[in-house]
């Protein structure tokens, strides 16, 4: 195991060369090279520039080789139906004309009239689409019959690329089935059908199934690329490769969502009934001789075209956001052929709306919502048809491919169909391609083993059916009236809170074990109780759990790391030697999510912290070790800021103190000050690094005296222009942080806040929606300080599901901010200034019974996250599908 393979995945708008390998840890997948693709007008037809594409493929191979990956095999997949013809010398006779070219107009209708729809469907099982290869060949026969006479080889686009690499001509089975020329029962070319349509049988190559090794690179190609690769035919139809990586068992309807949306189920035998034909379902080939019973739906092509035509630079995420805010309600039939290649997609959509008597969408948000709602309606109809035709109910819809990232569609589809929608992996096509190559080389025994790997290697997101949007919206509208009667701008409150990032602490996910090779016992007064199953065991699992938690939390996110989460490839690295390279996986992950990273030196749980002293230690060697560790952490934080485009808050907290009354309080504090001065000697751009210091009043092992007390760090921060961090669990039980914030804000431009929940002497319980949390949020909102505060969480609880702990705590922080934003602060201040304390108290109490829950549900709904009654079901599903499997794996290892 462990050899890299290359999967070339080309779609209608772009192509990628992906590298992947199978290992004991799962599947390592990385993008090596990306390039654009677009049909171009050539010789009067819309064509794919296959020469350009093959040049890009070769560039990608070279990049992989030059990066030291040492790939051993390669396989190509593309879209379906399009082809080239070769002459007897292997030279191309035709361009690869696109399926969107109008040359086939009217051809399909003529075939149906002369041959009969039922007869053709019973033989091929393929849906009637005007761009099918059969109709392209018949158009070519009519327009350029001499080309068919000269043709010695028919190769579909990925077959052609394989030929250019090896000199070997083959037709791959899954893609060949889309031609409407393969017999669905024999799974071979239908020679009788070819003769009846007057197509030369000799140009069609023997069908090869996915996993066939067709040869190595030609000598000239090997020399040009500087590598020897074995070419293994995957499922060359991109959808077939994507379905091969479907992580769920056969209990789901799948949607392979990209430029096209292909919705269906996987069968062992075809369904060629009258009902299937009437609904225009197709029976395409799959990996392992399976049948992909599916329906072609327009997919994201329409939104891609709208995005291309809109003035300005609209991203797909911006369009999705605009759609979520739109009130447009019209739906059109996205499966009409008029949307295949219109001159102007926006005008075509608007005209379709006019013809149906619908309001005409004008704004980007209305256009996007019209497309999304229409797609969802088409999906819903297809699911209903699948259940009726197959005679089986399906409880889940699994979306794979790039469209799985569209939370707006995913949630609305779950609501409309009343089925759980599972989204991911997004790179299913490349993964399926690689799995087939691995099976061919004996790394995996069969596709089921590969799918099991996918289940553990790639995170998925669950979207459960929510209460009907009209129900949530109607309750919200009713509640909104009550709040507006108090003079509150509800929409402004939503917008304000949505922009506040909350930094989620990674250490909740693994009970502060970290990922260091050198195992260290917890120290510094830190302890984690509980043993709930499913603890993350490595960085990949921790990131996967974090992604699941973040998918349940509305608003902006950040993630807070400790230095003990370095990933050093099994090489022991001391903390004072940590480098940016040890956090590259975290940065790559954060980039993929568009979030920032905050950072903390880990100045505990180490032999050099065993006696409870670190930066204040009397031993200079130990102090120097920790100084160098903190310096390394600031450098790593600067790397985070540079790579992610947002400052990284790097926070220093040390456990230094004494259990009993010390005989010298001053000297340890002098040493701590000198250590901090040494750490901060190097200047960093505040656009990259925000230096923060955190105090504590007492702790286990420092009950009598803490070196870095509140007074110490407050004065140090003031004198040295550092941010002061208030931790809600680091003060005496009679003190509350909400009472300190206004005093601090008078003298500090920025503050940092760690939100926890103290319980007696323990400071780090899961945050609940209690009075103090609400008061903290109220202080920040009414003093207009949300832009001056950096909010993070800091708790750890191993007695409950760790993802649930993240969700509960962070949702409560966001909930408290929204609660505060929906208060009439100006009026309450006025009552106080006027001395009308009776009215002030009455209003404060009255607000506690306002329908805030309806506001919160609407806020969550708009951002595509589960409401208060729904998120726990998602966590329980994740626990069953992912976290509990870790326990069984640990048991096997024992």
UniProtKB/Swiss-Prot annotation:
Query: One GO CC annotation, please?
Result: cytoplasm
- Residues involved in Mn(2+) binding: 730, 762, 764
Q: Which reaction does it catalyse?
A: L-rhamnulose + ATP = L-rhamnulose 1-phosphate + ADP + H(+); L-rhamnopyranose = L-rhamnulose
Provide the cofactor note recorded for this chain's UniProt entry. Answer: Binds 1 Mn(2+) ion per subunit.
Needed cofactors: Mn(2+)
Q: Which domain of life is it from?
A: Bacteria
What is a single molecular function from GO for this protein? ATP binding
Instruction: List the GO biological process terms.
Output: L-lyxose metabolic process; rhamnose catabolic process
Q: What is this protein called?
A: Bifunctional enzyme RhaA/RhaB
Protein's gene = rhaAB
């Amino acid at each position: 195991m462990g050899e890299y393979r290359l999967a070339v995945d080309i779609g209608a708008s772009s192509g990628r060369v992906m590298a992947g390998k199978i290992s004991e840890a799962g599947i390592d997948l990385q993008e090596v090279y990306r390039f654009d693709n677009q049909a171009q007008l050539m010789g009067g037809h819309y064509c794919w520039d296959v020469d350009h594409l093959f040049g890009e493929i070769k560039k990608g191979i070279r990049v992989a080789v030059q990066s030291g990956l040492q790939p051993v095999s390669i396989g190509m997949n593309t879209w379906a139906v399009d082809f080239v013809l070769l002459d007897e010398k292997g030279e191309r006779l035709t361009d690869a004309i696109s399926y969107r070219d109008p040359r086939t107009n009217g051809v399909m209708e003529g075939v149906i009239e002369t041959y009969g729809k039922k007869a053709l469907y019973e033989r091929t099982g393929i849906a009637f689409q005007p761009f099918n290869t059969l109709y392209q060949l018949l158009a070519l026969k009519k327009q350029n019959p001499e080309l068919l006479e000269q043709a010695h080889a028919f190769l579909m686009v990925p077959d052609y690329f394989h030929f250019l690499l090896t000199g070997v001509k083959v037709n791959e089975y899954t893609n060949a089935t889309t031609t409407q020329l393969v017999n669905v029962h024999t799974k071979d070319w239908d020679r009788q059908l070819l003769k009846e349509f007057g197509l030369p049988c000799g140009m069609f190559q023997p069908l090869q199934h996915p996993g066939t090794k067709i040869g190595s690179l030609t000598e000239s190609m090997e020399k040009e690329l500087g590598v020897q690769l074995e070419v293994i035919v995957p499922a060359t139809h991109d959808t077939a490769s994507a379905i091969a990586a479907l992580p769920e068992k056969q209990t789901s309807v799948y949607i392979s969502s990209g430029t096209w949306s292909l919705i269906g189920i996987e069968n062992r035998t075809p369904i060629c009934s009258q009902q299937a034909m009437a609904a225009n379902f197709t029976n395409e080939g799959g990996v392992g001789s399976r049948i992909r019973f599916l329906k072609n739906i327009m997919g994201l092509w329409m939104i891609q075209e709208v995005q291309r035509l809109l003035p300005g630079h609209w991203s797909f995420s911006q369009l999705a956001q605009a759609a979520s805010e739109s009130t447009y309600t019209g739906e059109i039939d996205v499966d009409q052929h008029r949307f295949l290649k219109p001159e102007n997609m926006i005008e075509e959509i608007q005209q379709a709306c006019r013809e149906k008597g619908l309001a005409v969408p004008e704004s980007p948000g209305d256009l996007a919502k019209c497309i999304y709602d229409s797609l969802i309606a088409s999906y819903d109809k297809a699911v209903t048809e699948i259940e009726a035709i197959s005679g089986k109910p399906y409880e889940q819809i699994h979306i794979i491919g790039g469209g799985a990232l569209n939370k707006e569609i995913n949630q609305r589809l779950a609501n409309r169909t009343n089925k759980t929608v599972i989204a991911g992996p997004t790179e299913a096509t490349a993964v399926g391609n690689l799995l087939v190559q691995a099976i061919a080389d004996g790394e995996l025994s069969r596709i089921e083993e590969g799918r099991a790997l996918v289940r553990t290697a790639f995170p998925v997101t669950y979207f459960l059916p929510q209460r009907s949007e009209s129900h949530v919206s109607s309750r919200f509208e009713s509640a909104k009236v009550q709040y507006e009667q108090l003079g509150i701008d509800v929409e402004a409150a939503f917008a304000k809170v949505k922009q506040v990032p909350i930094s989620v602490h990674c250490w909740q996910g693994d009970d502060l074990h970290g990922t260091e090779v050198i195992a260290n016992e917890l120290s510094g007064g830190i302890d984690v109780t509980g043993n709930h199953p499913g603890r993350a065991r490595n960085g990949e699992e921790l990131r996967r759990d974090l992604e699941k938690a973040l998918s349940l939390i509305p608003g902006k996110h950040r993630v807070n790391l400790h230095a003990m989460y370095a990933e050093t490839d099994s090489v022991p690295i001391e903390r004072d030697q940590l480098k940016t390279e040890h956090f590259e996986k975290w940065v790559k992950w954060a980039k993929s999510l568009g979030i920032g990273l905050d950072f903390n030196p880990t100045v505990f749980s180490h032999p050099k912290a065993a006696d409870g002293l670190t930066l204040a230690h009397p031993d200079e060697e130990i102090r120097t070790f920790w100084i160098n560790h903190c310096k390394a952490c600031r450098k790593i934080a600067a790397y985070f800021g540079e790579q992610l485009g947002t400052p990284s808050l790097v926070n220093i907290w040390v456990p230094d103190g004494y259990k009993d009354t010390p005989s010298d309080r001053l000297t340890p504090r002098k040493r701590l000050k000198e250590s901090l001065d040494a750490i901060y000697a190097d200047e960093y751009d505040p656009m990259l690094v925000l230096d923060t210091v955190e105090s504590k009043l007492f702790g286990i092992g420092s009950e009598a005296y803490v070196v870095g007390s509140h007074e110490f760090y407050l004065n140090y921060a003031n004198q040295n222009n550092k941010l002061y961090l208030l931790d809600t669990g680091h003060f005496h039980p009679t003190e509350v942080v909400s009472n300190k914030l206004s005093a601090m804000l008078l003298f500090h431009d920025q503050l940092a806040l760690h939100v926890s929940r103290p319980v007696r002497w323990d400071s780090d319980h899961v945050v609940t929606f209690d009075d103090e949390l609400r008061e903290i949020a109220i202080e920040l909102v009414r003093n207009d300080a949300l832009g001056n505060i950096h909010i993070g969480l800091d708790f750890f609880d191993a007695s409950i599901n760790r993802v649930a702990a993240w969700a509960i705590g962070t949702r409560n922080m966001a909930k408290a901010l929204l609660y505060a934003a929906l208060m009439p602060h100006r009026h309450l201040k006025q009552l106080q200034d006027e001395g009308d304390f009776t009215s002030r108290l009455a209003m404060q109490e009255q607000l506690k019974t306002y329908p805030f829950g309806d506001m919160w549900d609407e806020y969550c709904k708009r951002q595509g996250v589960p409401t208060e009654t729904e998120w726990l079901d998602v966590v329980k599903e994740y626990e069953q599908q992912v976290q509990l499997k870790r326990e069984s794996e640990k048991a096997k290892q024992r």
